[in-house]
Swiss-Prot record:
Compartments where located: Mitochondrion inner membrane
Role: Component of the ubiquinol-cytochrome c reductase complex (complex III or cytochrome b-c1 complex) that is part of the mitochondrial respiratory chain. The b-c1 complex mediates electron transfer from ubiquinol to cytochrome c. Contributes to the generation of a proton gradient across the mitochondrial membrane that is then used for ATP synthesis.
Organism: Dipodomys ordii (Ord's kangaroo rat)
One of the record's GO molecular function terms: ubiquinol-cytochrome-c reductase activity
One of the GO BP terms on file: mitochondrial electron transport, ubiquinol to cytochrome c
Positions with a binding annotation for heme b b566: H97, H196
Gene3D superfamilies documented for this protein: Cytochrome Bc1 Complex, Chain C (1.20.810.10)
Annotated transmembrane regions: 33-53, 77-98, 113-133, 178-198, 226-246, 288-308, 320-340, 347-367
Protein name from the UniProt record: Cytochrome b
InterPro entries listed in its UniProt record: Cyt_b/b6_C, Cyt_b/b6_C_sf, Cyt_b/b6_N, Cytb/b6-like_sf, Cytochrome_b, Cytochrome_b_C_euk/bac, Cytochrome_b_N_euk/bac, Di-haem_cyt_TM
Cofactor remark from the record: Binds 2 heme b groups non-covalently.
Membrane topology reported for the UniProt record: Multi-pass membrane protein
Amino acid sequence: MTIVRKTHPIMKMVNHAFIDLPAPSNISGWWNFGSLLGLCLIIQIASGLFLAMHYTPDTLTAFSSVTHICRDVNYGWLIRYMHANGASLFFICLYLHIGRGIYYGSYSYMETWNIGILLLFRTMATAFMGYVLPWGQMSFWGATVITNLLSAIPYIGTDLVEWIWGGFSVDKATLNRFFAFHFILPFIIAAMAMVHLLFLHETGSNNPLGIPSDCDKIPFHPYYTTKDFLGIVLLLAFFFTLVLFFPDLLGDPDNYSPANPLSTPPHIKPEWYFLFAYAILRSIPNKMGGVIALILSILILALFPHIQTGKQRSLMFRPISQFLFWLLVSDVLVLTWIGGQPVEPPFIIIGQIASVLYFTFILAFLPIAGLNENKMLKW
């Protein structure tokens, strides 16, 4: 008797990707975040679809339509908070996934890594546009400040900003187009995630030791489906604790006030998951320089495969690089904290030092540490 999953054209693809996929026998819980990101994307698309049924992308009614969802729609408050906190959960998993890739040297798979960086940019763009939609104070001013950064581009900057706005300020046209893009981008992200998986399955997964594992592979099901299921249960437990008990913990209180172009909030800041990049942007006094630093803070991830100097792929047996990696993680946390603080001493100088260290760790300290470890191991 032929097994359907091995012969049916569609089932065969699913089988090769999730059932009979040969996987290294020693991958740890840090490899769970790929499947958790898939779950987060499903939660976001599903909750977003239901929100879009009741939301109106119009400056006069956007804020009240969100209020209507929370007050009048059956379980609307739950759907709204699932979507808002789902974004935070998405970025938590995303940053842990990237951190694991850096720690264990997964950036050696160039195509997979580069598509991952494009996915990160797409996700950040989607989250930013989604943050504008409730049309609260921070939504409006966040959109104004961040889109205005494009005016730093020589010659075409001002025209480009007005083209994106659809007028001379953030208004109805801006909200409408942001809603359209926010709706379509998650489906593009889902398609790109499939390509990300396709390239990953061409090379096979990395493992904590960073060594070839072709001699010791096990089927993905039942071993890693069970392991992923445990990760999903833990993630959902954390997620619903956040949604049901602390729904506004990661939000901004200013967004409970309707957008008012005549009143500027005392401190404009994006959502918490962009604060590290926002701190780097603010730490450079020049507008153009700040925008370049902001883009490079993410784009620098693409350099990892090219500046890897260690003969060992993983940091598991490289104590100096391990120490520097955790200093880099601490530095990103400091930048996140600084991004949420007002622009005044001592936060300005702390942000500038942390920004310089961020680039120095990646471009200088980690490659030098790799060379030193090679010498210590007589390689």
